[in-house]
Amino acid sequence: MAAATALDSLPAPLRSLRLKTKQQELLLRVSALALIYVLAFVVRLFSVLRYESMIHEFDPYFNYRTTLFLSDHGFSEFWNWFDFESWYPLGRVVGGTLFPGLMVTAALLHRLLRALSLAVHIREVCVLTAPFFAANTTLVAYAFGREIWDSGAGLVAAALIAVCPGYISRSVAGSYDNEGVAIFALLLTFYLFVRAVNTGSLAWSLASAFGYFYMVSAWGGYVFIINLLPLYVLVLLVTGRYSQRLYVAYNSTYVLGMLLAMQIRFVGFQHVQSGEHMAAMGVFFLLQVFFFLDWVKYLLNDAKLFKSFLRITLTCVITVGTLALGIGTASGYISPWTGRFYSLLDPTYAKDHIPIIASVSEHQPTAWSSFMFDFHILLFLFPAGLYFCFKRLSDATIFIVMYGLTSMYFAGVMVRLILVAAPAVCLISAIAASATIKNLTTLIRTKSKSPQTVSGKSSGSKAAAKGAVDQSLPFQQNVAIALLLGAFYLLSRYAVHCTWVTSEAYSSPSIVLAARGHNGGRVIFDDYREAYYWLRQNTPSDAKIMSWWDYGYQITAMGNRTVIVDNNTWNNTHIATVGRAMSSYEDEAYEIMQSLDVNYVLVVFGGVTGYSSDDINKFLWMVRIGGGVFPVIKEPDYLVNGEYRVDKGAAPKMLNCLMYKLCYYRFGELTTEYGKPPGYDRVRGVEIGNKDIKLEYLEEAFTTSNWIVRIYKVKPPKNRS
């Protein structure tokens, strides 16, 4: 009464602002979503605040360079661009060998900002594209969670994915890679498809197809979608959940999505010819059979006759399908699975057959510690969420269960795919957290009712039982309060962990290195940019640079020089040739470099600073990749009793190969640690075995301040006498 009197005493304009319960809920929901949206964006800005606005890693530099070209020259020139500065002397057809979604998105955002009279450099747009789409992903996660469960689960899912380290790892500011927009497209496609299945709406189905098209344009991970959707449809068919809604949703999404995806030059006819896409086509035809059988069953209206017809139809379908698959494979129309696809099904395949795939760190199997590092408490909420989903089975919960289980399997096979599993883990964990909190709060709000006096023996016993329940209610409520406080504590620890991981682990650009000094202060190593600046200012504009493929994109984008190989890795033989040169004696390597018109050689060395991701640690992969094409290169020649060494006990070929000489040239004169002999390698923890290195065919051109990047000039051939 007092509250009502106080409200009535307010002025009329303020009294009109009183909201109904539903309006209050809507206001709180919108406010929470807005805060989550801002949080998702801001938490990814650590690298910009700590360093500066810059592009991270290796691949993003190619994406930035192509976006700059697109912004300056237009889409037509970009789509038909032949890049002479990469893969010399082969070059690269850029438009037909990339997924353009990321570049087009950033270019459109840049044009939009310019149209709004905001003078922003294209680099700043590229740096902030991933955080912007990560914030948008929280909105999709909310809508998806609400579609699967309820609005509470949607809000929790949005909050969890906003700070989930498994997603933040590839969406921080400066991480201008395909995954920055692809995870948004992935989740959007799944949400629209589930919405289409739930409603049977053609509009939602077509929207799902356009979401799939955006995913195809952005990242090769679209293969996960085009295989998960048919698997989901197949499960629904097997479990007797076929419906007209499912028929409309899948057929519309598949047909329109296929036609749109084929417009991407890098995909083209692979969508109807590649073995990786055949499952989707097979389920499409299977759905037509189901629709036909459903129609025949309605016409016949005779169970016995329909069973006979069903038996004949299934026999014909299986026979025709098997023949079509066999003939298509034998004739070469259906291409086999790619090496990356095989490596997902068999984790040992790449190591045994395609070492260049196995050499990439993000293609390695995932350690258990990585799951805990990237998911924290979600790793324990995930099984609980699966339990709640199975408890309330529907078409939507079946989909999220399948998405969660399949993505977690692939995340275990390849560490990079934790990124794909992150949205599923957040959604399923949100269901567990939301349902648990809702049950606990319902119990806490329950009011005890004293049993009424009733006549009769049976009524008396019921009242006694009810009284016993009411007497235990306070204890249950106390337990519920304790559990609720525990849940909020764990979620708060999750938030703290995510913030710490984002700040310390995922916000360090690999092009600028940082370490702690002896006094605890931060020491910055800016050697990469120093080396690329030197290349740009001190070498001829047509100079050809040979390095391991990891640094190709950065050299081209920042050094503005032609490279022999880069991160595209489309030509294994060309990369193997570079690996052979690095693994050979100097005179043999010189002949290879002359055949490739190499002017400078760039190597990365961490023996002075303790930087472990240097070329000496990558060298065995150069040997394996080179030996895979050129049998003259044999890995055992560089090992001693199966052990990789760089000290006095190292193999003779190791001590005299080009890579060893370029990394350790003049290093034997240098004292790196107090109390250690000259030539002490701080990464390997040993004194090098060959200190008296002489170069005959190359000469040192430049070494950065901390010796991390070393550049050598290839001497011109001597005149014939």
Swiss-Prot record:
Molecular function in Gene Ontology: dolichyl-diphosphooligosaccharide-protein glycotransferase activity; metal ion binding
Sequence motif DK motif, location on chain: 615-622
Positions contributing to dolichyl diphosphooligosaccharide binding: 416, 553
Membrane spanning stretches: 26-46, 130-148, 151-168, 180-199, 202-216, 222-238, 244-269, 278-297, 314-334, 368-390, 397-413, 418-439, 472-492
Site (Interacts with target acceptor peptide in protein substrate): 59, 362, 618
Motif SVSE motif mapped to chain: 359-362
Motif (DXD motif 2): 177-179
InterPro entries: Oligo_trans_STT3, STT3-PglB_core, STT3_N
Pfam families according to UniProt: STT3 (PF02516), STT3-PglB_core (PF21436)
Key words, A-Z: Endoplasmic reticulum, Glycoprotein, Glycosyltransferase, Magnesium, Manganese, Membrane, Metal-binding, Transferase, Transmembrane, Transmembrane helix
Subcellular location(s) per record: Endoplasmic reticulum membrane
Side Cytoplasmic, residues: 1-25, 149-150, 200-201, 239-243, 298-313, 391-396, 440-471
Gene3D superfamilies found in the cross-reference section: 3.40.50.12610
Region (Interacts with target acceptor peptide in protein substrate): 548-550
Binding site residues for Mn(2+): 59, 177, 179
Reaction equations catalysed: a di-trans,poly-cis-dolichyl diphosphooligosaccharide + L-asparaginyl-[protein] = N(4)-(oligosaccharide-(1->4)-N-acetyl-beta-D-glucosaminyl-(1->4)-N-acetyl-beta-D-glucosaminyl)-L-asparaginyl-[protein] + a di-trans,poly-cis-dolichyl diphosphate + H(+)
Cofactor: Mg(2+); Mn(2+)
Main location: endoplasmic reticulum
Glycosylation sites: 560, 567, 571
Motif window: WWDYG motif: 548-552
Membrane topology, Lumenal segments: 47-129, 169-179, 217-221, 270-277, 335-367, 414-417, 493-721
GO biological process: protein glycosylation
Family listed: Belongs to the STT3 family.
Function field: Catalytic subunit of the oligosaccharyl transferase (OST) complex that catalyzes the initial transfer of a defined glycan (Glc(3)Man(9)GlcNAc(2) in eukaryotes) from the lipid carrier dolichol-pyrophosphate to an asparagine residue within an Asn-X-Ser/Thr consensus motif in nascent polypeptide chains, the first step in protein N-glycosylation. N-glycosylation occurs cotranslationally and the complex associates with the Sec61 complex at the channel-forming translocon complex that mediates protein translocation across the endoplasmic reticulum (ER).
PANTHER family registered for this protein in UniProt: DOLICHYL-DIPHOSPHOOLIGOSACCHARIDE--PROTEIN GLYCOSYLTRANSFERASE SUBUNIT, DOLICHYL-DIPHOSPHOOLIGOSACCHARIDE--PROTEIN GLYCOSYLTRANSFERASE SUBUNIT STT3B
UniProt name for this protein: Dolichyl-diphosphooligosaccharide--protein glycosyltransferase subunit STT3B
Native species: Oryza sativa subsp. japonica (Rice)
Underlying gene: STT3B
